[in-house]
Amino acid sequence: MVAIHKPAHDVILKPVVSEKSYAASDRGQYTFVVAPDANKVQIKQAIEEIFKVKVTNVNTLNRAGKKQRTRTGFGQRASQKRAIVTVAEGQTIDIFGN
């Protein structure tokens, strides 16, 4: 399957900054919120283009939005797609400002 080229900043929306993703950065894994229609090949190409690192593995997951109670009834948070990207040994991505 050939990936349709999208601009890198349309594929990678933002990094996930949390304690869990910070701990995973010690293992060379970084978590990003990505476009819902992005595939693993597009995510790999975008990370390599933006951060100039070698990506060895990409895992993706779809997080369903939670139902939220509002004043007028129920609503729902937006669903999002995340990618956990593993970079080559010895390479890092500075998304935590270290």
Curated annotation (Swiss-Prot):
<keyword id="KW-0699">rRNA-binding</keyword>
<keyword id="KW-0687">Ribonucleoprotein</keyword>
<comment type="function">
    <text>One of the early assembly proteins it binds 23S rRNA. One of the proteins that surrounds the polypeptide exit tunnel on the outside of the ribosome. Forms the main docking site for trigger factor binding to the ribosome.</text>
</comment>
<dbReference type="InterPro" id="IPR012677">
    <property type="entry name" value="Nucleotide-bd_a/b_plait_sf"/>
</dbReference>
<comment type="similarity">
    <text>Belongs to the universal ribosomal protein uL23 family.</text>
</comment>
<dbReference type="GO" id="GO:0019843">
    <property type="term" value="F:rRNA binding"/>
</dbReference>
<comment type="subunit">
    <text>Part of the 50S ribosomal subunit. Contacts protein L29, and trigger factor when it is bound to the ribosome.</text>
</comment>
<keyword id="KW-0689">Ribosomal protein</keyword>
<protein>
    <recommendedName>
        <fullName>Large ribosomal subunit protein uL23</fullName>
    </recommendedName>
</protein>
<dbReference type="GO" id="GO:0006412">
    <property type="term" value="P:translation"/>
</dbReference>
<dbReference type="InterPro" id="IPR012678">
    <property type="entry name" value="Ribosomal_uL23/eL15/eS24_sf"/>
</dbReference>
<dbReference type="GO" id="GO:1990904">
    <property type="term" value="C:ribonucleoprotein complex"/>
</dbReference>
<dbReference type="InterPro" id="IPR013025">
    <property type="entry name" value="Ribosomal_uL23-like"/>
</dbReference>
<dbReference type="Pfam" id="PF00276">
    <property type="entry name" value="Ribosomal_L23"/>
</dbReference>
<keyword id="KW-0694">RNA-binding</keyword>
<dbReference type="GO" id="GO:0003735">
    <property type="term" value="F:structural constituent of ribosome"/>
</dbReference>
<dbReference type="GO" id="GO:0005840">
    <property type="term" value="C:ribosome"/>
</dbReference>
